[in-house]
């Protein structure tokens, strides 16, 4: 008798509506409507996951979405609404992929340009613009785009600052992003992850990178409003100047220097 | 709602008074006549008190002189077609209308140009939480929340009612140049007019607007503050017929759309003086788009578009299309009436007292308020009613109509009632002019609670009407 009950009928009600799954209609195709409790569970779960394994990009992304709503993602959209370029981004909603960016063309751009710096950085770190996850848990479709744009721009922030994707670099960039965008996930990462650092790492982080990140993040213009696709030819140093960002010390070089001193 | 003319009217009057006082002490006395009651100001409050005094048998034989600085000719012959509506419109509450009916004025008001409404929606522009009032649910069938009436329509009706009344003199285009009390006049006010005559009176009623010369002459202080906000009014055309009032609280100030007959609407947009000036300079198309944005988009969006008028016609339609149709938002505005955009500064002001020996203040002369509750004119109507009854009671007893003992009931009736209303409106304005997320959260919680608890709503409705 038990065998005759198909598995799907047992699972079906859970998919339709539970404590965690909201029953409101999808605002965009990839949307997963959640209840408040659902969002909280997601935040706690992905938070723990991220803390113990910060290489899990999917968990970091989920944590970002679960904590951005309500309020924070709307504040970020407000920053875009205050700026002509930000408004144009919201209207045109461009997406960044390895196709739309034409990486080969970027490799042939002049040294020091945003496009070249970005692609060199991608090649050096061995990542691709296609590794960015789709936004699912943000309810407002326009805010979902803001989140998506923030995520896709992340690699450009690396290119802009020259911070590597080792833990300290990633964290310094998180701190910069928190100061600049106000998204709580970046703030959580900035505060909690250093607990796992070795003393030397921690000293470097607190003495050099954190002050750099916070100072520049607060001071510079909102980097979410950069139309990266249009500034690829621009000199990175010039863009940094336009935005009001100083370049941080090269982290890998500094590591080597510190190792030599020993 | 507010009369902008009072401002220009004022300063020269005060200036001349001093000059007159200093020169007339030795000069021969000009011709002096007596009028039992002198009403200064031909606005709704002044005309209503005159009409009320001429209604009661106890006061109908008292001689009344009404002095108005401006010309009343246009008001007497006023009667535009149904394709034009004035931009100064007030929301008359049922109790104001009840009294106007009682004293025979309401029948002279052109009722085709009055729009009753039974629904009202107010919502928070930052959080979106809202409160809805609906009289058919709250107060039984057949009750209206209020009646949208052009101020000119009301004044025209009042003047019709006052036409050919005995013992009533209306002096328009006449300025009050000074008020003096001398031992010969038994310390009663001597009102010196710009036409050279002087009137001695038992009771001087100041219905002369926010910068009331009568109040100044009487040495009554009015205290309050500037909201540093301007009220922009305009007559707009709506996409379809409406019987609802709408108000959205933006951090820069509330924007309200009130229904008028024939698909017209009255707009009151309270905002920063700078933004009000920018809005007045927009082309009609841009302005219409901007008003629709103001009811739909985020405050940041609205502020950006006002700052960048070039982008209104290109960017705003896209922004509006991103908002899914929201049933809480009024129907689109399709046009703005030519030359109907005007703005004036908003102030909270309350006179220390409404009465002195032989003097009473009513309407804006006694108090000014923010238009967000639509109560400014109604407060003046309440004053006129209460003061007229106090005078009637004294006249019936044969008592001195100018003594503070006679006027005291008026003050007792109205002062604290008005003070409470001024305070509530002032706090509402302050509560909604912040974007602090904590305050926004709390006020939204409060508004949602009000919206879901019926007795609270009933109480608020009864207070408003």
Curated annotation (Swiss-Prot), chain A:
A Gene Ontology term for the protein's cellular component: extrinsic component of mitochondrial inner membrane
Recorded topology in the membrane: Peripheral membrane protein
Keywords: Lyase, Membrane, Metal-binding, Mitochondrion, Mitochondrion inner membrane, Ubiquinone biosynthesis, Zinc
Biological processes annotated in GO: ubiquinone biosynthetic process
InterPro entries (UniProt xref): Coq4 (IPR007715), Coq4_euk (IPR027540)
Region (Disordered): 243-262
Record keyword Mitochondrion present: yes
Places the protein is found: Mitochondrion inner membrane
Stretches with biased composition (Basic and acidic residues): 252-262
Reaction it catalyzes: a 4-hydroxy-3-methoxy-5-(all-trans-polyprenyl)benzoate + H(+) = a 2-methoxy-6-(all-trans-polyprenyl)phenol + CO2
Pathway: Cofactor biosynthesis; ubiquinone biosynthesis
Source superkingdom: Eukaryota
EC number: 4.1.1.130
Obligatory cofactor(s): Zn(2+)
Positions annotated to bind Zn(2+): 154-155, 158, 170
Protein role: Lyase that catalyzes the C1-decarboxylation of 4-hydroxy-3-methoxy-5-(all-trans-polyprenyl)benzoic acid into 2-methoxy-6-(all-trans-polyprenyl)phenol during ubiquinone biosynthesis.
Family to which the UniProt record says this protein belongs: Belongs to the COQ4 family.
Subunit (UniProt): Component of a multi-subunit COQ enzyme complex, composed of at least COQ3, COQ4, COQ5, COQ6, COQ7 and COQ9.
Note: This protein may be expected to contain an N-terminal transit peptide but none has been predicted.
Name recorded for this polypeptide: Ubiquinone biosynthesis protein COQ4, mitochondrial
UniProt organism field: Yarrowia lipolytica (strain CLIB 122 / E 150)
Highest classification ranks of the organism: Eukaryota, Fungi, Dikarya, Ascomycota, Saccharomycotina
Name of the gene this protein is made from: COQ4
């Amino acid at each position: 008798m038990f065998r005759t009950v198909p598995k799907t009928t047992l699972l079906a009600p859970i998919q339709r509506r539970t404590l965690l799954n909201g029953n409101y209609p999808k605002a965009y195709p990839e949307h997963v409507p959640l209840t408040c409790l659902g969002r909280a569970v997601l935040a706690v779960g992905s938070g723990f996951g991220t803390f113990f394994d910060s290489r899990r990009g999917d968990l970091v992304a989920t944590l970002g979405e679960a904590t951005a709503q309500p309020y924070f993602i709307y504040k970020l959209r407000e920053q875009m609404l205050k700026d002509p370029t930000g408004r144009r981004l919201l209207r045109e909603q461009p997406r960044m992929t390895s196709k739309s960016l034409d990486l080969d063309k970027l490799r042939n751009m002049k040294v020091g340009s945003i496009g070249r710096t970005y692609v060199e950085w991608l090649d050096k770190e061995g990542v691709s613009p296609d590794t960015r996850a789709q936004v699912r848990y943000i309810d407002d479709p326009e805010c979902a785009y803001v989140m998506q744009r923030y995520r896709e721009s992340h690699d450009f922030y690396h290119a802009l600052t020259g911070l590597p994707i080792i833990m300290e670099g990633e964290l310094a960039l998180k701190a910069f992003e928190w100061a600049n965008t106000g998204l709580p996930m970046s703030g959580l990462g900035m505060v909690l992850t250093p607990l796992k650092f070795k003393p030397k790492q921690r000293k470097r982080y607190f003495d050099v990178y954190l002050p750099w990140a916070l100072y520049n993040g607060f001071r510079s213009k909102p980097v979410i409003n950069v139309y990266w696709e249009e500034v690829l030819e621009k000199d990175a140093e010039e863009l940094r100047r336009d935005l009001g960002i100083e370049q941080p010390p090269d982290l890998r070089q500094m590591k080597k220097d510190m190792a030599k001193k020993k | 709602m507010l009369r902008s003319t009072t401002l220009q009217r004022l300063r020269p009057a005060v200036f001349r008074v001093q000059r007159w006082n200093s020169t007339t002490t030795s000069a021969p006395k000009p011709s002096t006549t007596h009028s039992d009651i002198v009403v200064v100001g031909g606005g709704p409050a002044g005309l209503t008190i005159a009409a009320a005094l001429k209604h009661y048998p106890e006061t109908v034989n008292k001689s009344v002189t009404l002095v108005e600085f401006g010309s009343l000719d246009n008001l007497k012959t006023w009667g535009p077609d149904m394709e034009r509506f004035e931009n100064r419109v007030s929301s008359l509450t049922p109790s104001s209308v009840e009294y106007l009916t009682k004293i025979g004025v309401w029948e002279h008001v052109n009722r085709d140009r009055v729009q009753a409404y039974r629904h009202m929606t107010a919502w928070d522009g930052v959080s979106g939480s809202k409160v809805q009032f609906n009289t058919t649910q709250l107060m039984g069938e057949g009750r209206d929340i209020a009646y949208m009436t052009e101020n000119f329509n009301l004044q025209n009706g009042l003047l019709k009612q006052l036409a050919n009344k005995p013992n009533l003199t209306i002096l328009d285009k006449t300025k009050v140049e000074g008020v003096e009390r001398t031992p010969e006049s038994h310390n009663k006010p001597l009102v010196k007019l710009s036409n050279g005559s002087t009137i001695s009176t038992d009771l001087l009623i100041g219905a002369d607007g926010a910068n009331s010369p009568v109040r100044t002459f009487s040495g009554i202080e009015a205290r309050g503050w500037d909201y540093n906000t301007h009220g922009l009014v305009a007559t707009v055309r709506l996409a379809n017929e409406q019987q609802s009032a709408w108000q959205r609280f933006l951090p820069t100030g509330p924007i309200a759309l009130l229904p008028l007959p024939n698909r017209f609407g009255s707009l009151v947009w309270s905002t920063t003086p700078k933004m009000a000036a920018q809005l007045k300079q927009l082309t009609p198309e841009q302005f219409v788009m901007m008003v629709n944005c103001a009811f739909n988009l985020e405050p940041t969006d609205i502020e950006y578009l006002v700052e960048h008028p070039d982008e209104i016609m290109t960017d705003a339609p896209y922004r509006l299309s991103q908002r899914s149709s929201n049933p809480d938002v009024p129907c689109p505005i399709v046009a703005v009436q030519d030359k109907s955009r005007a703005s004036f500064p908003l102030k909270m002001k309350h006179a220390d007292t409404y009465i002195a020996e032989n003097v009473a203040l009513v309407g804006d002369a006694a108090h000014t308020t923010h238009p967000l509750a639509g109560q400014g004119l109604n407060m003046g109507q309440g004053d006129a009613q209460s003061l007229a009854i106090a005078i009637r009671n004294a006249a019936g007893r044969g008592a001195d109509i100018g003594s503070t003992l006679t006027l005291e009931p008026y003050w007792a009736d109205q002062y604290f009632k008005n003070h409470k209303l001024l305070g509530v409106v002032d706090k509402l304005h302050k509560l909604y002019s912040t974007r602090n997320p904590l305050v926004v959260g709390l006020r939204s919680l409060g508004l949602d609670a009000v919206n879901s608890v019926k007795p609270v709503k009933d109480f608020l409705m009864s207070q408003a009407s």
